[in-house]
Amino acid sequence: MIAAISLMRRRDDVTLTAFRRHWLDVHGPLVCRFPGLRHYVQDHVIASPAMNAQAQGLHIDGFPILCFADDRERLHAHSSAEMAACNVDSRAFVGAVSRVICEPQVAVSPTVAVARTKLIALLAGEAADDAALARYAAWARGLPRLIGLVLYRVLQQGPAPASTIAHLPVSTAGLAEVAFASLVDLECAMAGVVTDAAHFVVEEHSLM
């Protein structure tokens, strides 16, 4: 499985409410038309004391995660007419974007069917660092009331290809998706945590 994850910042002249509604109601259905798309979620960043200073400084509003069977399917989708339509629509609400192509690895299988409250961790670093990702996973496994953990090993990252949206100059050594049953569980687990990873609290919307 290959995951294409975008780091999205909304346009300065678009309110957070308008950004969320357009992303969910207009852009989301366009993405669902991609050939070969196996799974698609939108992770909407929400305000929380568990969101640390590193994350706040990046001003990221959302993380779309698109999964394909392999890189051939991903490249086919990214060169499709459906992707071209999405690139045009993105101009209406996205101000800057970066894309990270990853190999997802389930480190802790979800213990409940649906977990919509999650922590997205961007590990500090200019390039992929599998050892750092493994260390983060070992630490995250010890969090109280953890119900799921997915690691995203970085294969490539940079500007979104064929996009006319400005590039968001953010790099990462790896990503982790840490799931909890509730926002209360997440915030209690992260209270007092000190890390150089950027921690974003997100609400997940599954579209496919």
Each model region followed by its residue ranges:
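Macromolecular interaction modules
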Residues: 1-208
